């Protein structure tokens, strides 16, 4: 269905396959349009951007932009992260990319599910697609220390780190603590509070959302 839709829009299925393959290989990793274009067979950066935005406008994946702390908004010129909207969409993209499910992708898919839930609760214009989010972002320091999500919720920025593991150490939330002074760490099954940082299982967090 996806391939036939793209062909109706006069898009190339080989380019779609190569872009899908690169997206699946780079889940939760910031990408540049140039880098994605080179890895998709050396196509033009604008072509890579167009295909990704079509996937996002088709509700198949969402584009997570870098969060500018001073402006409290996206920085479109920075690298962005791409996530399938749903684990089932991962399988759709895997079929397009002619690859099989990689179990190593599970933590990244869980991260993507968290992002999807945050979008549903913070974004007001999802009917226009997932290419231009205005309240859900990621953040990375000049030393390449990353926070998985930063959401603007009722005017407040809330940093969220997904650590899908049972054992959590202070090093797992150092970046949130130093850069934001507060935040949530979503774990596999661990709870903890520590000086403005609160840890709870992903499942509990998703259950508590409206």
Labelled PLM ranges:
Residues 137, 158, 184-185:
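A structural signal for isolated positions on well-ordered beta-strands in alpha/beta enzyme cores
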Residues 163-205:
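Catalytic cores of nucleic-acid endonucleases
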Residues 152-168:
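Active-site ExK catalytic segment of metal-dependent nucleases
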Residues 148, 157, 181:
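Conserved acidic residues
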Residues 1-147, 151-154:
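Accessory nucleic acid-recognition modules appended to NTPase machines
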